[in-house]
Amino acid sequence: MVTHGDKIMYRISKVLNHNTVIGIHADDNQEYLVMGKGIGFGKKVSERFEVRDGDTVYSLQATSNRGNAKELATSIQPIYLEIANEILDEAEKVFQNIDRAVLFPMADHLEYAV
C-alpha cells in the first residue's frame, strides 16, 4: 500500500534519518515507512505524528526474494531509500502511474552498486 498524505496519525517506531521514519499506523497497528522532508527531525520513538501532503508512505508488510520490507528498510542506508524515492517521484511526473513497490529493490540495488 502506498498513499500520499492521508492525514492519519502514526506513532514513531524508529527514526532512520531526518527524512525517513518507520511509523505504526494508528488504525491498523501495522508498520509503514514514511518519507518526507524533515519528518524525522527531532522526533523520538513513540512520538505521534501526522502524514503531510507530499509525504510518501510505504507498507512494510510485503516480502520479496530479498526478505521482508521491514528488514530491507532497516538494512538499507536511508540515503538510498531517499534517492530511490526521488527517482520514483520523477518517473511519476513523466509516466503518471508507476508501481512504487519497486522502492526497496531499487534502493537495495543502488546501495549495492555504489
Give the label of every model feature segment.
Residues 2-114:
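A cross-family "folded-core" feature that marks the main globular domain of proteins
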